[in-house]
Amino acid sequence: MNAEPPEEKAASEAEAGAMPEKRAGSRAAGGNSLQGFGRPSVYHAAIVIFLEFFAWGLLTTSMLTVLHETFPQHTFLMNGLIQGVKGLLSFLSAPLIGALSDVWGRKPFLLGTVFFTCFPIPLMRISPWWYFAMISISGVFSVTFSVIFAYVADVTQEHERSTAYGWVSATFAASLVSSPAIGAYLSASYGDSLVVLVATVVALLDICFILLAVPESLPEKMRPLSWGARISWKQADPFASLKKVGKDSTILLICITVFLSYLPEAGQYSSFFLYLRQVIGFGSIKIAAFIAMVGILSIVAQTVFLTSLMRSLGNKNTVLLGLGFQMFQLAWYGFGSQAWMMWAAGIVAAVSSITFPAVSTLVSQNADSNQQGVAQGIITGIRGLCNGLGPALYGFIFYMFHVELTELEPELISNNAALQGAVIPGPPFLFGACIVFMSFLVAVFIPEYSKGGIQKHSNSISGSLANTPERGSDEDIEPLLQDSSIWELSSLEEPGHQCTEL
């Protein structure tokens, strides 16, 4: 195989570090795959995330009711199992979908993940059993964040990504500011059927936006030269992806940090609203107001504060600060027995939301420009594993401590009385604080920035493959992504058509 001409190499180097405006020009010949409104930008990704989670936020109150009506016994436990199955399926599929988006582009997988994630929404009123079954199965495609973060990496320079990831995460929080309150109001005034209808319409709007307005962000030259490809299932195996993590100490530390920090967060997210309503005595309005408060503060934390912290403290110290706040708020929830304590801990929880965008920036810095989907897919896969284990773990701990959803009325005098006498009112949250403490200890050993871990090749795919015979040399090879190919071209190499490995 011949090395690519200097002109093409220079062009590809410019492509790897260009701003979205410059990228758009080089992709002008992309054809129909670039259909969309304007140039690819962070705003497209933010709108997709906002609409998807706004639709689900509308169902917050209704879902609590349907969950209790469908599983009147062991509600916490069943909630944990449902979310657990969904999370495990997400773990299995995230590396594959992230890697496929590196091959075929981001837009088709944005469309697929949003469609299948929102597919269960109308089933809530049609058949609750099918609704919860489809929620579990939809975990196969519930990896929108993986593709979104890869999309953002495509359209931003490296030094811009922490801010961009912060905006995307803040958009997620913004989608939950008003949607639960709107859903609670519509449910109380017009019934759950209207809430489900509105959520379905919002989900359809999101799908139409992706289909008609979102342009493709991945350059054509970063994709395979032939469609005659077959899947190498060994490389598509999520456990194989996790094995690659161990080849790079920096990525290994990051992944362990993500696992230990997100495991309690996933459990908390799956059960906290039930906990507020059952144990603390929050009504639907208070729950919606609580979500709005935390959402607004999270937006401020992930935009204004995150940017300032990244500049003043650095990436690693920002992650450590976020983990410290997360540990504090979980311990507060664990020992808290009064409503005001929940509100105060919610403020701390909002500040701790800076952790994930800061970690995503660390991952992006240690991944090659044409492997952002794979790298973010691995992190999303780990989060998916936590989404499976966390809810099940919290549900089991609630079950062991005999905390059950026996009533949905806000006035829970007997439960509150029992809560007052409990030494640890929220055992799962205190357990989560201990896990986050271990995550903090691991994160201490993460280097601020490691260029030696995964080489930052600015040349294009074809150019890097031209040097494939030299991989046996003593030079450093990117340890995480060197075996991340999931595609093997079935066509023989011909003059002018070299085998492409991603």
UniProtKB/Swiss-Prot annotation:
Keywords: Membrane, Transmembrane, Transmembrane helix, Transport. The keyword Transport applies. InterPro entries: MFS (IPR011701), MFS_dom (IPR020846), MFS_trans_sf (IPR036259), Sugar_transporter_CS (IPR005829), Tet-R_TetA/multi-R_MdtG-like (IPR001958). The chain crosses the membrane at residues 47-67, 80-100, 109-129, 132-152, 166-186, 194-214, 249-269, 279-299, 317-337, 339-359, 385-405, 426-446. Residues 1-12 have a biased composition (Basic and acidic residues). It is found in: Membrane. Residues 68-79, 130-131, 187-193, 270-278, 338, 406-425 are cytoplasmic. SUPFAM superfamilies: MFS general substrate transporter. Residues 1-46, 101-108, 153-165, 215-248, 300-316, 360-384, 447-502 are extracellular. GO terms for molecular function: transmembrane transporter activity. It is a multi-pass membrane protein. Pfam families: MFS_1 (PF07690). Residues 1-27 are annotated as: Disordered. GO terms for cellular component: membrane. PANTHER family: HIPPOCAMPUS ABUNDANT TRANSCRIPT-LIKE PROTEIN 1 (PTHR23504:SF32), MAJOR FACILITATOR SUPERFAMILY DOMAIN-CONTAINING PROTEIN 10 (PTHR23504). Belongs to the major facilitator superfamily. This is Hippocampus abundant transcript-like protein 1. It comes from Bos taurus (Bovine). The gene is MFSD14B.
